[in-house]
């Protein structure tokens, strides 16, 4: 039988993954309102970087030493960068106000990219929770928050093409990739328990890359710097609140 810890991890991963549906729903509701999106991007980038640098990496260094932790961090960044190169995680954007069948065709490639990019997030969640339930909950919240503006940005152009059913199906399948990643994380921890501190640093590398490579350029594209900074400040406030409310 599965332990309560494993069940809790899988439920957290599933709930976090399914926040992709919220991103799609907001894209349908707000459509061309990008102010909400830019604040969300800033908030998402801030919360993921804060948890990576102030939670995951310090815990990894404390348990495994700085050299091993940095190597694992580099490997995490490198693997996601390679994955991003092989399957580019492109956010679809209208060109000159036109939407055509080429956009929908490209959407399938984006959907595939979303699934592959969500997989390591589930892995990060599982390893963090095994090390500390409080830390795991923080990571789950960070990933859930990150999913919303990311899916919003992906979905908004296709909403204009009136492909809502495709969007929800894509978001749902993408969300299921996180529990799948969590299962992989649990298997890794079960068979390689001594490596769990390194898995956390590895996961931090993945989260840092996602923030810097996807969220920051996405915000730059919308040219709303003040709203992006507002989102970052909100993330700091929420992060500090969560560290007080959620026990380690």
Predicted regions: what is each one?
Residues 1-248:
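Intrinsically disordered, metal-sensing/regulatory segments
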